[in-house]
């Protein structure tokens, strides 16, 4: 008999999962077999719809709550107390104890994993009391310890907050803390770092790896990011359309992939450094197709958007009468210029103020002070009617198209909405314009009568881009527009955006935390930290000769799609993020910059890093 230490913690044997739909039976997973050993990280990689998440939910017996059925095969788990659990035939009461204690799960979308009506403290403490039988005081102390472990600033204050009060990155850190709370034997991580900044991602990956080493836990890591696979995996399982197409040690998968799909997946990964020596954006390679050669998108020297000393603050209420007791300094003294037909990328961690800058430009959030000028018009001086007219020149593409599109309206109605609102097109002209927009974003016109839920994530984002283009804007603010998409779909959408820029002369303010993507699409880059721009300049200069210590830390944190270049714990020395909340009488120092080379500026004012 095998020694207990080398027996697998989890086994999938010929797993088959089906879903019943109006059109009949749909196979989610077919004939899937692999095992996960103690202290091992198995990365399950593939695109949306490949069956990665379905296989993980099957081991948790959660797939049945989503309409799935375990139609064949075996699932086995070895709990901490010993023995072997037949997961397929386990009773619901048994599985309730297993979830949390023996299997912890980190979900991709933290807003759906957290309860919006309970505080963070209540949600963390509830699981600790249930599974570990801790008292209220001990559970709260453990919750605080977990919050510190996942590097959440001001953890005591965050415990008292609700999920909607935290940024996306902070919410995901809370979900990770909840999954780690009971020190599970098997940790299932379903795209846990997809929407996180590179520094936080590097730390979370390091944290999961350290937990694995300390406890001997096994990790089933689900991702579509091959760079993350290179950093985390001992073994890799590649899935495509519900089936396993390749399995092997991580070095073998990267150095000598056998299946065509694995080769194509590796080819589509944007790698930091690929753009070295080039000044202008370039398209990404597409799965199964050669990228078409395009002329460099040079743009113009004529300024479109000028931002001077932009400051945005939010009041913090407290006390019995809910008076303003402090302010969040979200954006502090930000200035930049964006030329026509060019892309300026804002990069930085969650909470650094990059999204607030984008919203402040469109006055979706009212700035505290500063000046925003678009095409010679100053937005701050405008009446409501003039602002509405000016907004036709500026449009926004949000991170989650499922949230920004109305689930009850057809795609035709949604793309036509801005045209109707501004009265630019009617009747047949309206229909023709919407059809043209679908052609521009490379969607079939047969989709016009469909609803958002009938499309994939990449297709929904194309609809969001079509709606943003409806009024022929000059500026598009793309707020994490591709961060939640698969690598091949992301490449398609980015190439689409670059093609539209070349053809229509659009300017993009591209807000992102993905440095490899930013390197591909940008003419210029501004790095933000705690509300300030710490470094700004041409993309080639900022990426090839970074000057500010924070920019260097960001570059160092980017995972590289090469198992031989794994990041070590000692390389990841990030400083805790200071609080952006200050007293009402606090007066920040003005931003002072040094010009290193032409148009390459670095902040000299102390910014907390």
Predicted regions and their residues:
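Conserved ABC ATPase "signature" region
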Residues: 138-157, 378, 428-446, 555
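Short catalytic/signature loops enriched in Gly
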Residues: 5-8, 84, 153-157, 250-306, ...
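Conserved ABC ATPase signature
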Residues: 161-166, 170, 451-455, 459
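A short, proline-enriched helix->beta-strand linker immediately N-terminal to the Walker B motif
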Residues: 181-185, 470-474, 490
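Conserved ABC transporter NBD signature motif
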Residues: 70-85, 370-378
């Amino acid at each position: 008999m095998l020694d207990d230490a080398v027996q697998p913690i989890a086994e999938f044997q010929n797993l088959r999962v089906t879903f019943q739909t109006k059109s009949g039976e749909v196979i989610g997973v077919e004939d899937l077999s692999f095992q996960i050993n103690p202290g091992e990280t198995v990365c399950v990689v593939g695109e949306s719809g490949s069956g990665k998440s379905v296989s993980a939910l099957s081991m948790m017996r959660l797939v049945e709550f989503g309409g799935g059925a375990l139609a064949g095969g075996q699932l086995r788990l070895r709990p901490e107390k010993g023995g072997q659990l037949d997961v397929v035939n386990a009773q619901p009461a048994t599985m309730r104890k297993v979830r949390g204690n023996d299997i912890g799960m980190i979900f991709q979308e933290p807003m759906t994993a957290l309860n919006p009506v309970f505080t963070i403290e209540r949600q963390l403490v509830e699981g600790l009391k249930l599974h570990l039988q801790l008292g209220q005081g001990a559970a709260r102390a453990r919750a605080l310890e977990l919050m510190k472990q996942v590097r959440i600033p001001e953890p005591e204050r965050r415990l008292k907050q609700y999920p909607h009060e935290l940024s996306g990155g902070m919410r995901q850190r809370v979900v990770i803390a909840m999954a780690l709370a009971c020190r599970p034997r098997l940790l299932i991580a379903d795209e846990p770092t997809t929407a996180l900044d590179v520094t936080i991602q590097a730390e979370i990956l390091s944290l999961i790896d350290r937990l694995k080493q300390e406890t001997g836990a096994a990790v089933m890591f689900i991702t579509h990011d091959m760079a993350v696979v290179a950093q985390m995996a001992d073994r890799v399982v590649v899935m495509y359309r519900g089936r396993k197409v390749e399995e092997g040690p991580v070095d073998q998968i990267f150095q000598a992939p056998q299946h065509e799909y694995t080769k194509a997946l590796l080819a589509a990964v944007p790698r930091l450094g690929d753009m070295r020596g080039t000044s202008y954006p370039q398209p990404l390679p597409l799965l199964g197709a050669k990228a078409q050669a395009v002329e460099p998108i040079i743009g113009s020297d004529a300024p479109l958007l000028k931002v001077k000393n932009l400051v945005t603050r939010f009041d913090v209420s407290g006390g019995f009468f809910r008076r303003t007791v402090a302010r969040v300094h979200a954006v502090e003294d930000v200035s930049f210029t964006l030329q026509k037909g060019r892309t300026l990328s804002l990069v930085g961690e969650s909470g650094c103020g990059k999204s607030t800058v984008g919203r402040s430009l469109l006055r979706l959030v009212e700035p505290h002070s500063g000046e925003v000028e678009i095409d010679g018009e100053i937005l701050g001086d405008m009446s409501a009617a003039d602002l509405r007219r000016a907004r036709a020149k500026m449009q926004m593409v949000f991170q989650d198209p499922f949230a920004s599109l109305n689930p009850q309206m057809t795609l035709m109605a949604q793309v036509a909405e801005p045209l109707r609102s501004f009265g630019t097109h009617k009747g047949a002209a309206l229909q023709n314009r919407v059809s043209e927009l679908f052609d521009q974003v490379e969607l079939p016109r047969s989709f016009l009568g469909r609803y958002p839920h009938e499309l994939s994530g990449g297709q929904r984002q194309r609809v969001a881009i079509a709606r943003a283009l409806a009024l022929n804007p000059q500026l598009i603010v793309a707020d994490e527009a591709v961060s939640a998409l698969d690598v091949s779909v992301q490449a398609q959408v980015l190439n689409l955006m670059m093609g539209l820029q070349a053809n229509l002369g659009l300017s993009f303010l591209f807000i992102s935390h993905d440095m490899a993507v930013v390197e591909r699409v940008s003419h210029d880059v501004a790095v933000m930290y705690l509300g300030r721009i710490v470094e700004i300049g041409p993309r080639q200069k900022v990426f090839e000769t970074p000057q500010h210590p924070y920019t260097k830390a960001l570059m160092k944190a980017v995972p590289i799609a090469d198992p031989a270049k794994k990041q070590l714990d000692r390389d990841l020395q990030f400083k805790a993020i200071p609080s952006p909340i200050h007293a009402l009488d606090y007066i920040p120092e003005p931003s002072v910059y040094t010009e290193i080379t032409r148009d390459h500026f670095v902040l000299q004012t102390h910014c907390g890093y």
